[in-house]
Each structure stands twice: as C-alpha cells, then as structure tokens.
C-alpha cells in the first residue's frame, strides 16, 4: 500500500500547488491524506475547499487547532467521515477524531487526528486518547496512521515511540517546517517529526514576510495574510505492508511545479 501525506496546506497558493501535484502524480498512490486546517486564507477550511480536495483525489483531510475557524464547516465535519479534527478535544465537540476507510485496492486503513499539549491550548491527553483509539481500531485493521498536530518535537518523538509497533505510520504537523528525521522505528512504525507545509516559501511558515517582521519588531497586533510566490509541496510517501500493518519505506517529498522533486 502506497500512501501520500501532504503537509499543512496554506491558503490559495498551497491549494493550487496541491491541485497541480495531484493532477500529475495521484495515480502513483493508493491513499492520499492532506492536512487542511490552514487552507482557507491560512485559517480553517470551508465546505467548498474540502469538496475541492476530495474531487482532486484526496481520501481524507486531517485537522488541528484551526479546524474550527470557519463555522460553516461544523455540520460538514459531523456528517463526513473524510474530514477530521483532533480526537482529544472535549466530549461533545463537533466532528470526528478518526476514520476507517479503504484504499484503491479495498484495504482498510485508519487515520487518527491528535493535537499536542506542549506550548498549545489545553486538550485531553493525546497519549491516553491514542492508546484508547488504537486498541479500538486495531480490531478492524492493522493499517493505522496518526497525524499529531503539535508544537514540541519532544512530544512528537515520545508519542511516536509510545505507539511504535501498534500503528503503521506516525507523522507530525503544525510547525510548517519539514524535518529530516524520517525513519522506521524499532517495531515497524514509520516516523517523521513534521511533514512540513504546502504553500509559499517567500513568507514565514506561509504568512506574508513583512507582516511577521513587523510583528517581531513592534510586538503590535498584525493582520496575518498568506504569502505568495515560490510555492512548494512538502510531505512524505510511505509504503505499508497491508497484511502486517508495518511500514516498509518512508521518504520525504519536497516538490515545486518549476523545479520538480528536490533532494
């Protein structure tokens, strides 16, 4: 089973880059995951954008702390099994924290969305939530993937190793900076601390450069706007043995329309 994971899509530049990439390469993959919580001008996701992603070949959209920025998506999240928000939010919050779908070949595959607690808003324990959901989902499929939307690399490493051998793939999102620590852990789980961002490289993690510089210089509130130009797609491609649920290969992707795949 070959899985594509695309990092946090930031605004229209990120969406356009994703569309071009999928038009060229989506047939190479059995299952496609994107993180869409920054896809609507950097804050949240709309119904129109979610539908566009799915029409382009995305199988499931994961979320994070910006999942609720657009209120129109609330009911959509309740009714769809193809868009997720972090599972460790309080009981009664709209949406779903995990889903079990099928890849192109009919293999069952699950995605769990979780959010970290270090340097972020208080939520339920991601470790205990992960353990509960993994134990539940493993009764249905061994092919389990976790998107951990978190700030601290240490928290990501800890939860990745805590889950090692019980899931197929653990990857981080949120920082918008792709890390170079992809590997297969001791018990067969693919791991990377952060898959990176899909959007403009001209700003600061997807936001207009001048705005961010002014924020640092003055400490005054700024209106954040999405950066444009020199777009890139960051993510990973992963091969999973669908019979055992073990990761066989994990590879970073860094791609632009003008330059193609970068090493």
How does the language model describe each region?
Residues 1-263:
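Acidic, metal/ion-coordinating pockets
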């Amino acid at each position: 089973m070959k899985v594509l994971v695309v990092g946090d899509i930031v605004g229209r530049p990120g969406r356009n880059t994703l569309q071009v990439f999928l038009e060229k390469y989506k047939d190479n993959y059995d299952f496609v995951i994107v993180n869409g919580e920054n896809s609507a001008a950097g804050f949240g996701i709309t119904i129109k954008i979610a539908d566009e992603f799915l029409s382009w070949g995305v199988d499931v959209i994961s979320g994070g702390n910006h999942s609720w920025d657009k209120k129109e998506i609330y009911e959509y999240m309740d009714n769809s099994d193809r868009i997720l928000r972090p599972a460790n939010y309080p009981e009664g919050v709209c949406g779903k924290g995990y889903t079990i779908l099928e890849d192109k070949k009919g293999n069952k595959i699950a995605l769990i969305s979780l959010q970290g607690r270090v340097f972020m808003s208080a939520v339920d324990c991601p470790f205990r939530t992960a353990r509960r959901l993994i134990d539940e989902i493993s009764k249905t499929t061994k092919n389990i993937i976790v998107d951990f939307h978190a700030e601290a690399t240490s928290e990501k490493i800890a939860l990745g190793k805590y889950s090692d051998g019980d899931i197929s793939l653990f990857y981080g999102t949120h920082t918008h900076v792709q890390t170079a620590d992809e590997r297969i852990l001791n018990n067969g789980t693919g791991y990377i601390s952060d898959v990176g961002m899909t959007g403009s490289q001209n700003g600061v993690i997807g936001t207009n450069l001048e705005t961010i510089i002014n924020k640092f210089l003055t400490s005054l509130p700024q209106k954040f706007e999405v950066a444009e130009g020199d777009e890139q797609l960051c993510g990973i491609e992963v091969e999973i043995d669908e019979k055992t649920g073990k990761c066989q290969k994990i590879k970073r992707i860094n791609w632009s329309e003008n330059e193609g795949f970068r090493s």
